[in-house]
Amino acid sequence: SVFAFENEQSSTIAPARLYK
């Protein structure tokens, strides 16, 4: 997924902005 580069399921939990 675009938002969850680490895990596809992470997209539903939190967007990539949180990881960055």
UniProtKB/Swiss-Prot annotation:
Superkingdom assignment: Eukaryota
Keywords recorded for this protein, A-Z: Pathogenesis-related protein, Plant defense
Induction: By heavy metal ions.
Location of the region described as Disordered in the Swiss-Prot/TrEMBL record: 1-20
Keyword ATP-binding: no
Keyword RNA-binding assigned: no
GO biological process, one term: defense response
Family, per entry: Belongs to the BetVI family.
Protein name: Protein PR-L2
Species of origin: Lupinus luteus (European yellow lupine)
Taxonomic classification: Eukaryota, Viridiplantae, Streptophyta, Embryophyta, Tracheophyta
